[in-house]
Amino acid sequence: MTAENTAPATPPPPSDFVRDIVAGHVAEKRYPKIVTRFPPEPNGYLHLGHAKSICLNFGIARENNGQCNLRFDDTNPVKEDVEYVDSITTDVLWLIAGWADAQLGFKPKGAKPTALISQGRPDFYLAPTAPSAQSEAFFASDYFEQLYNYALELIQKGQAYVCDLSAEDTESYRGSPDQPGRESPFRSRSVAENLDLFRRMKAGEFPNGARSLRAKIDMAAPNLWLRDPLLYRIRHVPHHHAGDAWCIYPLYDYAHCLSDYLEGITHSICTLEFVDHRPLYDWLLGSLDLPRALPHQYEFAKLNLGYTLVSKRKLLQLVQEKIVAGWDDPRMPTLSGLRRRGIPASAIRNFVTGLGVTKFDSLTEVAVFENAIRNELNPLAHRRLAVLKPIKLVLTNIAAGESIACEGTNNPQDETPTTRPLALTREVYIESDDFAEVPPPKYFRLKPGGEVRLKYACIIKLDEIVKDAAGLITELRCTADLTTRSGQPNSDKKVKGTIHWVSASQAIDAEVRLYDRLFTVPEPGAS
C-alpha cells in the first residue's frame, strides 16, 4: 500500500504596506481591475532578487483576482538578447506554475497597441490575453511607434528638445546634488527645429551619440533625475525583437512609465533605487494629458542575501570570466541554477514571501533560505542511504552470499510511510568519517570495541581493524547482532550511534555533486 507525501501547508496571505495600499484602492473601487507587471530587462538570467519581485507582483494580482503582465523592458539593444528572453520566460513560468498561472498576462503574438478613443481623445491600449501557443510576453519594443509619437507631442508642447552635447558634456552640465546644473546651449531651439532634428534622428541621418532628445524640466532641481533627463539616444544597432526598424531608442525612464500606461497597469511596483525616479515617472505621464487612469509607482526594499550575489551585472562577470559553468551553474543564485540544483519553486516562493515587504534595506542570512528549502523538501523527499567516502566493513557472522532482508523507511515524516527493501550482506561500506581508530571524547560512532546501529538493520560491534603493509586500513571486521533487527527479540536495544551503510554487492554507483556557498564572505557584493 502506498501513501501520498504530505505537502507543506500553504501559508496565509501576507500583509505589508504595498498590499495595504492596494487593499485601500480595491475598497474604494478606484480601478476596475488590479493590474501589476514584472518588467525585466533581457540582459541576463533571473536571480533570487527577481523572485521577490515576481512573487510580490503576481501575489498581489492573485490575492485580488487581478492580472500581472510579463513585459520585457527591452530598450537597450546593445546588451539584450533573445537567449535572455527565453530563459526569463521559462523561469517565470516555472516559478508561478500551480500558484499564479491564472494571473499571467500575455499578448497575442505580434500585437501592437490598438488606437481607440478615450474620454473624447485619441489613445492607445494593448489588451492582454491568456498564455497559449498564439500568445507571447509583452515587449516595450512593440511600443516604439507610440513612444515616438508621444515624444513628438512633448516637443510640440515645448517640453522636450534635441541636444547636441556629448555624453561627457551632458554629465558635466548636470551638476551635483549640492550644485545646480547648467542649461544646454541647445535648450532654446524652436519647436520646429526640434521636430525636424528628431525626425532626422529617426531617419538615421546622424551617427551614434551625435544627438539626443531630452526632457525640458529644471536644471536646478534638487532631484538630479529631473535635470533635463535623456529620453532618446541614437544607436545604429539591430534590436533582438524589433530588428533594424529603429536607430533611436528610448531610455528606460521614458519607456517604462508609458509602457505601464499602454498596458493599463495600475500599480507599478519596483525596488528602492527607483524612489528618485518616481517624480520623473509622474512628470512624463502628467505632461502628455493621457485620458485613461494613470499608473502609480511604489517602491520596496530589494532582497540582499548573505554569501550571495543578487546583481545581474556581477553574475554576468562570473559567467564571462568562467568562474562558474554558465548561468545555470547549480552554485549560482539564478532561478535556472536553483532549479538545476533541485530546489522547488514553492520553496523559493515561500522564502521570499516570508521575508515580508519593507522600505528598509537589510541583509538576510543565507541560513534562512536554506531552512526554507529544508522545510519544503523534508515532507516530500524520499530518503536513501549513501556512502561517499567508503571504508569496507566485514560482518564475520554473515556467510558469503547470504542476504538478510531489512526495510528502510522512504520518508519518516509521512503519516503512513512507505518502505523499501534493503539487503544486509557480509560486506558493506560505511562512511570513513563514521569510524575513528583513536576517537575523541564523546564519540558515538564506530570505534575499536564499540557498538553502533546500522540504520534500518542491526547493531554491530567492531572486533578487528585490518591494515595493509603501509599501515592503511583495508577493512573493519565486525560482529552483527542479528537479534537487534526490527521484529527480533532485542530490537529495542539502544546504542548512542546510528550510521549509514550500503551493501558492497548490491549498491549502485552514483555521481554525487556536493555544492557549498559560492562565496566565503557574507557580503560579496559590497567589495
Question: Where are the language model's segments positioned?
Answer:
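C-terminal, non-catalytic macromolecule-binding modules
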Residues: C458-S527
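Intrinsically disordered or highly flexible coil/loop and linker segments, enriched in small
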Residues: Y31, D101, A160, P207, ...
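Structured alpha-helical segments in the cores of large, soluble enzyme domains
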Residues: K52-R62, V85, T89-V92, D244-H256, ...
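Short acidic (Asp/Glu) and glycine-rich catalytic loops that position anionic groups and cofactors
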Residues: G66-C68, H256-T266, A293-H296, K314-L318, ...
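N-terminal Rossmann-like or analogous alpha/beta NTP/dinucleotide-binding catalytic cores
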Residues: T2-E183, E273-Q297, K302-S311, L316-V319
